[in-house]
Amino acid sequence: MTAEQASALLTVMTGFIEQEAGATRKVVAAITDLDYKPDPKSRTAGELAKHLVTADVWFADSIADGAFVWTGDSGTPPELTDPAAIATWHEKHLGDRLAKLRSMTSEQQLREVEFFGMKAPAVTWLGMMNNHAVHHRGQLAAYLRPMGSKVPAIYGMSADESLV
């Protein structure tokens, strides 16, 4: 990968992540029962929402810093007490991290970073970050109607929200 390709990938992926983050916050804000879980093996809606928003920040920090360091669940910020607070926290902290990612030098974008035994240039891990968020947002969106909430439009209108 050339420096120009890495820069283009960074621009495209941070744009995608920023766009997806808006949909993520809509899904989080739609939660009406943080304790809801569809199965005993599932996380609660609150646990899943908190994981989703804090993982976005962890991924971004790890990519920008050039190292994924997993020390287990380091705890949830205490201010993540309700859906609105979770969405607000995500907007603030992910916005800061996207700026940090966009300021990476070519050398930082291209440095090899290991993620659970896989090695790739730092900038390529933005795809994994985006996929992780989309995956967990999909899980959370599937919780909404069974908990009695409305499903927001994500990629197009839903049965509960029109785009026109």
Regions found by a protein language model. Name each.
Residues 1, 43, 78-81, 104, ...:
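Short coil/turn linker and secondary-structure boundary residues
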